[in-house]
Amino acid sequence: MKIKKFLDEANLKIISELTKNGRIKLTELAKKLNVTPAAAKERVERLIKKKIISISALINPEEIYPLSACIGIEADADGTNIIIRKLRNCPLVFHLAKTSGNHSLIINMVAKDISQIEDFLNKQIRSEPGIKHVEVNLSNSIIVPKYLPLRFFPSIDPEYVACGLRVDDEERCPDCPSVKR
């Protein structure tokens, strides 16, 4: 595979260093790799271009949202696809994955309180056809990773929230962070 060959010792070291400190200076990174800053920059840019890494701000969710939930959903194929389409851009969701086993879909989300999780479950999941079973596990502490790629972006269109629902739609989550305040 080309990707495996591309991830040589130097590229793995770059990934390791950027994981520890995404703001490391190229001169410092170059010293750790024993290469020139230009060579380090070229390698970082190639890793980004090949979509192996992405450099962005991560957020400590506990500073904003004290609760998190892991939601397991058992649904038919249509129900699973509906939920994926609805939640793909939800700012509260930080992990969404199709699975095999007891659940067809796993959702990890953050919330400010239990009522926000209940609203989310009732409006975004339980209301959809094809949902057979929903299992929720609550957490008040995310241990690893401590920082997450939460998406606090306002919707591009002021009439719609990030998930595609209208701002005035009764089905949207009342505390959606994508609504401009």
Located regions from the model:
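A compositional/biophysical signature of low hydrophobicity enriched in polar/charged and small residues
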Residues: 1-181
